From Swiss-Prot:
The gene is moaA. This is Probable GTP 3',8-cyclase. Its EC number is 4.1.99.22. It comes from Methanocella arvoryzae (strain DSM 22066 / NBRC 105507 / MRE50). [4Fe-4S] cluster 1 binds at residues 21, 25, 28. Keywords: 4Fe-4S, GTP-binding, Iron, Iron-sulfur, Lyase, Metal-binding, Molybdenum cofactor biosynthesis, Nucleotide-binding, S-adenosyl-L-methionine.
Length: 307
């Protein structure tokens, strides 16, 4: 097993396939990457997945940039060892045409980013015109081929989409969709749009029929009359970081222990399996939570919480 000094076991990989994107979202964290060189290859993805699988890693999330800009994404999926959960986070604009083949290539599910149901707001956030309908088509295609549950990622933005939460909850209700409401992290000076997710969560909690705490980040998912709503609150959240159980891989094949740090990246490009394995063990051992608690110093065993 891959365990760090805080008792956090690495059970999943988050692999960035590219820095390129066809949208220009005003807040984009680009998975914490700065400009990188050439993109990770099919063989490199297969290598890190194969090695990590030997240590019990059974989940892979692909992200970016826009991962569907990789024309060889099907090939990447087919090169993976058996996994319990393979998913991608995408802006959805290129999904409609590719959903079926991605499913056939082994993708289990997708997260689609959609911050607003209002065309003009969507255009402002993404700084691109003519893409909104493509995203809705992408979600429909994912549903029809069974890339489910489809999570709808909504970054909660002050003065932009705060009034759309109920509408988004109605959109996901009764379908294999989950609404994931995400606290904005400060990138590109977009923090002026930071909205209070803690108060929103309190309101959702009061209306919920049931709540379940996920192992990853100890995020809570609420059930509201047939709708599922997950809240992601990463900022100043030591519990979130203490339950961070995945290792990031950058789009130029470096191990990246934390989204918010770039001074501890380790390149594994060109290394043999044995060399990658040695670097992996050392890098995981040195991993630290970004936000730390004075009292809770180790990851606590997982249990299901009910409200
Ligand atoms: N600080 C921090 N934020 C994260 C991390 N992972 C995810 N997030 C936040 O959560 C948001 C949603 O992430 P997704 O790519 O949809 O994937 P996920 O929710 O982590 O994974 P699944 O729920 O399993 O699909 C991201 O945009 C980030 O804002 C992390 O490791 N650290
Ligand atoms: C960086 S994007 C990459 C994948 C894909 N292009 C997409 O937009 O879904 C991954 C996720 O990060 C979210 N995200 C980007 N910047 C963020 C920020 N500053 N704070 C919180 N979430 C952010 C996006 O909304 C998206 O759901
Ligand atoms: S679509 Fe994703 S990667 Fe592209 S700019 Fe928006 S958040 Fe960033
Ligand atoms: S340690 Fe915290 S900030 Fe860093 S990647 Fe994990 S959850 Fe995100």
């Amino acid at each position: 097993m891959l365990i760090d000094a805080y008792g956090r076991r690495i059970s999943s990989l988050r692999i960035s396939l590219t820095n390129r994107c066809n949208l220009k979202c005003i807040y984009c964290h680009n998975e914490g990457e700065e400009d990188s060189g050439s993109e990770i290859t099919v063989e490199e993805v297969a290598q890190i997945a194969r090695i990590c699988a030997r240590y019990g890693v059974d989940k892979i999330k692909f992200s970016g940039g826009e991962p569907l800009l990789r024309r060889d994404f099907d090939e990447i999926l087919r090169a993976l060892p058996p996994m319990r959960d393979v998913s991608v986070t995408t802006n959805g604009t290129l999904l409609a045409a590719r959903a079926e083949s991605l499913k056939e290539s082994g993708l289990d599910r997708v997260n689609v980013s959609l911050d607003s149901m209002d065309r003009d707001r969507f255009t402002f956030i993404t700084q691109c015109k003519g893409q909104f309908d493509k995203v809705l088509d992408g979600i429909d295609a994912a549903l029809s081929v069974g890339l489910t549950p489809v999570k709808i990622n909504m970054v909660y933005l002050k003065g932009i989409n705060e009034d759309e939460v109920d509408r988004m909850i109605d959109y996901v209700r009764g379908k294999p969709l989950v609404l994931q409401i995400i606290e904005l992290m400060n990138f590109h000076g977009a923090f002026k749009y930071h909205a209070d997710v803690a108060s929103l969560e309190q309101r959702i909690k009061e209306k919920a029929d049931k709540a379940v705490c996920r192992e990853m980040h100890r995020r809570t998912k609420y059930y509201l009359g047939g709708a599922e709503v997950e809240i992601v609150r990463p900022i100043d959240n030591s519990e979130f970081c203490m339950n961070c159980n995945r290792l990031r891989i950058t789009s130029d094949y470096k191990l990246k222990p934390c989204l918010l740090k770039n001074d501890n990246l380790v390149s594994v490009r060109g290394l043999s399996d044995a060399e990658v394995e040695a670097v992996l063990i050392k890098t995981v051992g040195a991993r630290e939570p970004f936000f730390k608690s004075e009292t809770a110093k180790v990851c606590q065993p997982y249990k299901i919480y009910e409200p």
